[in-house]
């Protein structure tokens, strides 16, 4: 069986600010891509990475339904027409339901916006690459759209939207304490695996791809609950989070998440 290589690529989100990752996994002759970028430009950059690898792209796994996970997909599909795009059924449903609204929300991207949705096949089980199994894990009842991949031989965990490294954590889609508690439960499940490579869906470039992403995300979620109880409104909660995590990126996550948690804004 071949040995796999994992390359973590730092991409734009929002445009002009590198906070999103994609992961290119390569074997002897084939490649798997996890997540497909936020912009058409980054879609081209991913296509170039795949071409430079010299491997045949067989599968693209879209791990979540937010635009930074799939807006670049059409460029990759055009470059590699034989590659399969897969996602869990609920992620496909969310993408199809929200796509037009997300185009309007991110209209400032202009020509960097996608022009169409690619065909995405439902994934209900594990993925394989050259005989290596990537287990599809997660998706509890409280968070059915949140999965991650686990490759046991290489002790590699591709965490998607569940993991953040030195970023403000995106909590706007987990507006209740119950949802955030379920998230923490998934993080504890991840920690139990004792992974050696841990790829967060969002990170500041240069930060480590290891288990510290799990503990950092967990600590942030607990801090969010603590500051939420003390804050009078969304602005106060945002200020408290920024003060507590002055070096974290993705300030937009703190701003929007605080408003949603305080009932000042609806999201999704």
What kind of feature is each model-predicted range?
Residues 2-11, 107-109, 128-133:
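Short Pro/Gly-enriched beta-strand edge/turn motifs at strand-loop
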Residues 38, 133, 140-141, 146-215, ...:
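Metallo-beta-lactamase
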Residues 48-126:
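Active-site HxH/HxHxD metal-binding segment of metal-dependent hydrolases
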Residues 25, 124-129:
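Short acidic-hydrophobic surface loop/beta-edge motif
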Residues 2-52, 148-160:
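Conserved beta-strand hairpin/beta-sheet module of binuclear metal-dependent hydrolase folds
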Residues 34-36, 58-66, 86-89, 157-160, ...:
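Active-site neighborhood of phospho(di)ester-bond hydrolases with catalytic His/Asp-centered motifs
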Residues 25, 35, 50, 64, ...:
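Divalent metal-coordination and catalytic microenvironments
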Residues 94, 192-197, 205-268:
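Accessory terminal helices/loops
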């Amino acid at each position: 069986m071949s040995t796999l290589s994992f390359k973590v690529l730092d991409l734009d989100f929002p445009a002009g600010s590198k906070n999103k990752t994609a992961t290119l996994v390569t074997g002897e002759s084939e490649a798997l891509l996890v997540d497909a970028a936020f912009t058409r430009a980054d879609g081209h950059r991913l296509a170039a990475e795949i071409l430079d690898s010299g491997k045949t792209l067989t599968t693209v796994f879209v791990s979540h339904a937010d635009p930074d996970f799939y807006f670049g997909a059409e460029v990759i599909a055009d470059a590699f027409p034989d590659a399969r795009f897969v996602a869990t059924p609920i992620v496909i449903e969310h993408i199809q339901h929200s796509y037009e609204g997300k185009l309007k929300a991110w209209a400032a991207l202009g020509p960097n916006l996608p022009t169409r949705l690619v065909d995405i096949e439902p994934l209900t089980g594990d993925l394989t690459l050259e005989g290596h199994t990537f287990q599809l894990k997660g998706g509890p009842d409280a968070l059915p759209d949140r999965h991650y991949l686990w490759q046991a031989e290489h002790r590699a965990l591709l965490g998607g939207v569940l993991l953040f490294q030195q970023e403000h954590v995106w909590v706007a889609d987990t507006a209740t304490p119950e949802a955030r508690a379920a998230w923490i439960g998934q993080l504890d499940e991840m920690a139990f695996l004792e992974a050696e490579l841990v790829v967060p869906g969002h990170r500041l470039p240069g930060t480590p791809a290891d288990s510290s992403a799990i503990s950092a995300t967990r600590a942030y979620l607990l801090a969010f609950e603590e500051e939420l109880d003390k804050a009078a409104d969304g602005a106060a909660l945002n200020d408290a989070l920024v003060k507590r995590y002055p070096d974290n990126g993705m300030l937009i996550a703190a701003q929007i998440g605080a408003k949603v948690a305080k009932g000042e804004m609806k999201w999704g």
